[in-house]
Structure formats: C-alpha cells, structure tokens
C-alpha cells in the first residue's frame, strides 16, 4: 500500500513539474497615463482595453488615483482603447505589441451629450480591501446618515469604538488618528469627544493602515486611521443638502457646495446639529475589611443627558497656478455648546445587605468648545509621472471649557448638603510644517524624503471650590521634528519598500499649581520595511515591519481632571513615559470575480506599555475608601493576532462584508506603592488574555430599489490583571430609497436595535473591593435623513464605478 502511494505521489509530482515547465506565452508590460483634456487632471479608474485581433479576447487594467496604469498582457496584435464613463472613448489603431511599451499620456474628452442623457448608477463599494490598508467610503453607508465621525469609525473594518468613545484598531487603543493625512486641530483636545461632535457628512472616506511606512507619523503602536474630509471634484456647480431628525431628540442639517473650473475649485461644507444622547451606568460593589471579611455593599446608579448644539464650517479653494503647480487653502471652524447633567444615587448596605442610607450626587455641567484651523498646501508636479514636491502648513487653536456645580447630600438629611464648583479650561495651539518629495527612479524605482515639524502647547486649568487641594494648572508642551527617507522598487513579481524615520522629541509636563516640572528629551529611529510578492494579478502576499511610538497626553498626564464621582476618581500620571512598539504583519490578498479575501497574522511587542491600575487613595467618604485609577508603564506587552476581511457579492442585489479579528495579549510587570498606612503594596500584573471581535454587514437591494443594510457586531469577553470585560452583541439597521429621479434620497436608520451596546466589567482588587459595572454611553437611536443633490446626481468623478472585487489596483507596496 505504501509503495503504491509513493508511486502515485512521484507520478503526480513529475506530471505537475512537466506541466509547470511548459513554455508560457511571452508577456509584456504596458504603462501610461490618462488625463482629462483641457484640465490635465488625472482620471482615476479609467479602463484600458486590449482586444486581441484574432481571438477577440479582452484584457487590460484600470488607472490609479494619479491616472497611471501598468499591467501585463500577452504579446500579440491588439486594438487598444481607453474608456471612462461620460467621456468619449479614445481608440489606438491596430498594432503589434512584442515588447514592453509606454503608451504615454492619453487625453480624454468629456462627452457632453452623454452627460445630459444618462444617469450613472454605479457607485463606490462601501469597503475596499487592499493588501496594505482598508478604505471605507462613507457616502454609501446608510448607517451613518445624520451621525458623527465616531459613528463612522464604528463601522470601519478592524476598528472598534467602545461605550466611552475610545477608538481601537484590532483591539489596540494605541491608535494615531489623522485628518487628511496630518495631525489636525479639528480632532480637538479630547479626541474621543471631538469625534462625537464632527458630522459624518463632512467625511468622504476613512483609510485604515495597520503597519504604516516611514512617511507617516511614527505615533500609534496599533496603526493609523486617516479621516479624509469631503471635497467636491466634479466640474461646474455641484452640491447637496441634508436634513435629519431623530429620537432621542436629534435634528440637524448640512450643506456641501463646490464650484470647479479649469483654474480653480471652490469647496465648502456647513453643518448644524442638535443632539441629545442620554446614557446610564451602574456599579455594584462589595467592599472588604483588611481580614478579607465583607465590610459593606454599595449600589451606584447613574443617569445622564449629553445635550450638544453646534455648527461646523469648512471653506477652501484649489488654485491651479499652472499645469504643474497647485495651491490649496482651507479654513475650518467648529463650535459647540453642551449641557451634561449627571445624576448619581449611591445606595448603601451593611455586610448583611441591609439598607443603611442613600446618597445623591448631582453634577450639573455645561460646556463650550471652539476650534479653528487654517491649512495650506503647495503641490509641484514635474515632467515625469509621480515626480512631485508638496509643502503643507497648518495652524490651529482649540478652546474647551467645562463648568460644573456638584450637589452632594444624604437623602432625608437636608443638613448634609454639600456644594462644590469645578471649572476646567483647556487651550491648545498646534502648528505644523511638512514637506514631502517623491522621485521616480528608473522603470519601477521610487525615492521619497521629507520633514515634519509638529509644535503643540496645551494649558489645562482645573479649579475646585471650596476644596482647593484638587485644583491644578497643567502645561503640556510637545515639539517633534521628524525626518524620513524611503526607497522602493519592483522586479518581476517582487516589490519592496524600505524606510527610516528619525524623530527628535522635546516634551514638557508642568504642574504649575503643584510646582512639579518635568522635561523629557529623547530621539528615536523608526525603521520600516515591506516586501510583496504577486502570485498573479489577483493574488499577492506581503510581509511588513515597523517601529512605532505612543506618547501619553491629556488626562493621562493631569493629576486631577474630574470629580464626577467622589469615590472613584481618575488621576493622571505626569511621570508616565512613551511606549515603543515593534509591529510585524504578514498579509495575503486573493480576488475572485465576486469575492475579495484578505487575511493577516500580526505580532506587536510593546515596551513600557500603558496599564491602568486601581489603588486606595487613603481618603474616605462616609467610611468608604476612595479608589484612584491611574495609568502606569508596565514592562512589556505581547500581542499576537489573526484577522481576515472579505467582500462578497453573490448577486447584483446583495453585498456582504465581514471582518473577524482574534488576538492573544500577554502583559508582564509588577507595581509597588506605599499605601496611606505606610505599608508597601505589591501588585503583579502578569496576565494572559484571549479575545475576539467580529462584524458582518449585509446590504440588500429590495424591490422598488429600496436598500436594506444590517450591521451585526460581537465583542467577546477579555480578561485583564484586575478583572475582565464581558461579551457584548449589538445590531444596527438602515433602509434607504432614491427618489425624485435619483436626485434625492430618504433613509431610516436604527442604532443599537436591542439597546444592548454597553461596556460590562468585573473588577477585583484583593481585600479591597469586588465590583460589577455596566456603562451605556447612548441608548437606542432612530434617525430619518433626507438628502437632495443638485447638478451631480450619481455621476461625480468621485463616484466612478469600482470593480466588484474592491481591489486596490495600481497600489505600490508601502505607498501611502
């Protein structure tokens, strides 16, 4: 039996070897560029068709964002043509192609008659899967109509947003969020809160880059999320108006306008919104005596309303100073006022769970926020394709103020009433200078170099009356100068990209009220490397490495920033150091006619990783110890995971997108502190956690052209050194219908259909407290949105049809 099996295997091997060694038809490389006649603007997703004279077989490819195409065809006689929706075809006469050839620049002219008579219904896919990144196109996602950028990110593959608005990529909260490829003042001082205020309608797409090249900011151990703001691209005057209303009480409107000619492009966006986001939380805690016996129980019940009213405006102009020089200027404003009443009841019980009293704490808070940013960009294009120089400038200012009056009393005892006032004023200034140079070398080489200077100053003034012990003024200064260079090339089926980034950091953390001054100066080299191999046009694999940094900011550093609870207080740590991460990613991409599949295995090793610890403060409220939560540096964190994404279109009327991520996280470290009794308390944070996350999105076109979209997510349980989070499932629904001859649409979306989206935690501090908590930032929401489009319908340049496989054709590995 074994001999027969051996003979069969050898025979099969010889047959396969002989088949693999058969002579293949000669392949040649065809390249070139497609532009719009008259404006010289590149045409993205134009199709280059090669039709074999004898067999009539079709082959070819599409252009990238720069209008450039490059693909292989079998040598032979062809008729060649360039096609682009609403443009006249360009035909190239019959010719024999036997060697590599550059077709040069192909100019295409708009077909005016066709534009008048045709409504183009093809559209961008919601999610595009590429080997090195995922692109989420906001425009076609019904779930985020009338929502915020936080809602947008919560629909992006690989990204999760927890109940408090914290953004994580593959479960890693060490994420750098960019706007239009740069750090931006629009993200505000508290980025989680800012993302809840920015309207989704202002965003065109979101790019998720898990292992960025040296060109990008080195910050973000988990990767980079780049939010690309909307800017009209179609010729003439175009725009859209959107109005929405929902329950809980929510309403708003936004207007997008742009006017484009050969010499300039004016773009603008204005939005107004009023939102009420009621939420709630609970904590059930059991406190212990020093000998481990139960001391008491406390039930904490919290309700809050987060009412915000604000506007945002963005105005800009692209000036085509010449065919090779463009100057862009943009000015953005954002203002918001908030009312955030927070009402907490503490129900006290003795060790036998007999009621002993009830305390009420009302935090009546109002807030105001204003952000302004001016940005300018110069782009110089040289004669050779992709040879260019860009210079970016940005200046931003942010102000965030919070004023609160806190009323605290024992129910039934008016004399116990205590009143506190808190004022929290924040100011931020950020200046940015960035320049990037790209030089193509030879047939497939690419050299890049650049500089980025980021200069930031934050001032936080926190005042508590009448208890001045909790008051503090914190000054944070961050100056980072960065230089990078990288080079990439391609030969046969291999391509590579090697880069090195150097960052010199000067950080000051000064607690002015406490006379505590900290200055930290450090510099780091951040290497990056990517190797890619293409098995075929539809299958490729890549291996990448990068070094990343995560700098603590804001509440991580401020010793005092909130008193919303008087027994559970968050306290920043001004001595915390940045963490450094080595990231390795192995990815595979496969495309079929109806399916795109991307999978990756990744490893992140982080030194000085951030970890939140809880400890006794030495203070008591009615005999209850006040617990402090504070961040520290642990020695190491190991994170290894596996992820896959897929787009599947089984039918023209049904599209599926799925994302699954699982990872194992191991932390190693010990922490010791001296408690209020003078005892040295040692805590071991060695912990191994395993968890997973999945999201499935289904979009179905029903009869009468009604679109139905369903999003279902599940976050599995996860343990940590002092407890665990429990699993949570949630679902969103949306329906949309185009009306008025496709010039308008109306949509209905329901967020958190089962009202189940919460953060559920179990915490254990030995001989101190065991607790169970639930936190729901926003209850179920229902929203109706009406959108009207004028002079653009669905035939804008930025809505050209993409392949069903959502492939990233033309992407050079490592290229941003």
Give a label for each model feature.
Residues 35, 49-51, 83-87, 100-142, ...:
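Short, acidic, small-residue-rich periplasmic hinge/interaction motif at the N-terminus
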Residues 51-56, 79-94:
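A short, solvent-exposed loop/turn motif at the edges and junctions
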Residues 52-68:
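Short, acidic Ser/Thr/Gly-rich low-complexity loop/linker segments typical of extracellular
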Residues 72, 149, 155, 182-210:
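Short acidic/polar hinge/loop motifs at secondary-structure boundaries
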Residues 104-107, 149-150, 191-194, 208, ...:
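N-terminal periplasmic accessory domains that precede
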Residues 223, 227-241, 299, 310-316, 506-508, 537-583, 603-625, 629, ...:
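Surface-exposed extracellular loop regions of Gram-negative outer-membrane beta-barrel proteins
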Residues 430-434, 468-483, 573, 577, ...:
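Outer membrane beta-barrel strand-and-loop segments of large Gram-negative receptors
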């Amino acid at each position: 039996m074994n001999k027969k099996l051996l003979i069969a295997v050898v025979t099969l091997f010889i047959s396969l070897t002989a088949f693999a060694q058969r002579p293949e038809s000669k392949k040649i490389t065809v390249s070139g560029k497609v532009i719009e006649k008259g404006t010289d603007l590149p045409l993205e997703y134009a199709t280059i068709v090669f039709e074999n004279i004898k067999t009539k077989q079709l082959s070819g490819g599409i252009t990238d964002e720069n209008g450039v195409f490059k693909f292989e065809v079998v040598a032979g006689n062809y008729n060649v043509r360039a096609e682009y929706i609403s443009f006249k075809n360009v035909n190239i006469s019959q010719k024999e192609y036997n060697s590599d050839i550059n077709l040069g620049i192909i100019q295409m002219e708009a077909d005016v008659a066709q534009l008048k008579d045709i409504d183009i219904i093809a559209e961008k896919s919601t999610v595009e899967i590429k080997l090195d990144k995922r692109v989420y196109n906001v425009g076609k996602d019904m779930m985020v109509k009338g929502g915020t950028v936080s809602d947008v990110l919560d629909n992006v593959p690989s990204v999760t947003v927890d109940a408090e608005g914290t953004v994580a990529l593959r479960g890693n909260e060490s994420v750098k969020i960019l706007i239009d490829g740069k750090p931006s003042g629009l993200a505000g001082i508290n980025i989680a809160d800012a993302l809840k205020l920015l309207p989704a309608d202002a965003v065109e797409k979101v790019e998720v880059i898990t292992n960025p090249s040296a060109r990008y900011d080195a910050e973000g151990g988990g990767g980079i999320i780049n939010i690309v703001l909307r800017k009209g691209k179609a010729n003439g005057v175009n725009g859209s108006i959107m109005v929405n209303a929902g329950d809980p009480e929510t309403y708003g409107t936004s207007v997008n306008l742009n006017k484009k000619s050969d010499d300039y492009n004016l773009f603008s966006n204005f939005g107004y919104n009023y939102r009420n986001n009621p939420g709630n939380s609970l904590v059930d805690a059991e406190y212990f005596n020093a000998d481990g016996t139960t001391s008491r129980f406390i039930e904490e019940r919290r309700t809050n309303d987060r009412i915000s009213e604000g506007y945002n405006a963005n105005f800009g102009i692209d000036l085509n100073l010449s065919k090779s020089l463009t100057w862009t200027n943009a000015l953005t404003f954002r203002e918001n006022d908030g009312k955030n009443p927070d009402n907490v009841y503490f129900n006290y019980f003795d060790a036998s769970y007999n009621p002993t009293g009830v305390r009420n704490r009302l935090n009546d808070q109002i807030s105001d926020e204003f952000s302004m940013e001016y940005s300018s960009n110069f782009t110089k294009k040289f004669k050779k394709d992709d040879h260019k120089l860009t210079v970016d400038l940005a200046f931003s200012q942010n102000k965030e103020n919070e004023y609160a009056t806190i009323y605290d009393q024992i129910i039934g005892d008016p004399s116990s009433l205590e009143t506190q006032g808190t004022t929290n004023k924040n100011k931020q200034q950020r200046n940015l200078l960035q320049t990037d140079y790209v030089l193509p070398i030879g047939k497939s080489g690419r050299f890049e170099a650049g500089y980025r200077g980021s200069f930031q100053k934050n001032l936080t003034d926190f005042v508590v009356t009448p208890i001045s012990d909790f008051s503090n003024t914190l000054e944070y200064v961050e100056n980072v100068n960065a230089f990078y260079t990288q080079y990439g090339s391609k030969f046969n089926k291999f391509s590579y990209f090697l880069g090195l980034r150097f960052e010199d950091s000067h950080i000051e953390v000064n607690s002015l009220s406490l006379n505590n001054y900290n200055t930290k100066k450090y510099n780091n080299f951040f290497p990056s490397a990517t190797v890619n191999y293409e098995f075929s046009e539809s299958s490729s694999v890549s291996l990448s490495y990068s070094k990343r940094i995560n700098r603590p900011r804001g509440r991580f550093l401020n010793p005092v920033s909130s008193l919303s609870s008087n027994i559970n207080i968050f306290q920043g740590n001004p001595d915390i150091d940045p963490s450094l991460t080595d990231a390795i990613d192995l990815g595979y991409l496969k495309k079929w006619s109806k399916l795109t599949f991307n999978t990756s295995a990744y490893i992140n090793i982080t030194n000085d990783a951030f970890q939140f610890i809880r400890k006794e403060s030495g203070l008591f409220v009615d005999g209850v110890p006040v617990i402090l939560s504070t961040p520290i540096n642990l020695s190491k964190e190991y994170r290894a995971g596996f992820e896959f994404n897929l787009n599947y279109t089984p039918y023209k009327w049904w599209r599926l997108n799925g994302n699954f991520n699982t990872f194992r996280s191991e932390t190693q470290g010990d922490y010791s502190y001296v408690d209020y009794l003078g005892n040295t308390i040692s805590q071991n944070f060695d912990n191994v956690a395993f968890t997973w996350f999945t999201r499935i999105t289904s979009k179905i076109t029903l009869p009468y052209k009604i679109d139905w979209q369903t999003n279902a997510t599940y976050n599995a349980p996860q343990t940590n050194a002092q407890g665990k989070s429990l699993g949570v499932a949630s679902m969103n629904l949306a329906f949309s219908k185009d009306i008025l001859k496709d010039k308008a649409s109306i949509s209905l979306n329901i967020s958190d259909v089962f009202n189940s989206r919460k953060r559920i935690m179990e915490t254990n501090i030995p001989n101190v407290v065991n607790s169970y908590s639930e936190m729901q930032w926003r209850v179920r929401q229902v929203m109706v949105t009406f959108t009207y489009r004028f002079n653009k319908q669905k035939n804008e340049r930025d809505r050209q049809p993409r392949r069903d496989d959502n492939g990233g054709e033309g992407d050079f590995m490592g290229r941003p």
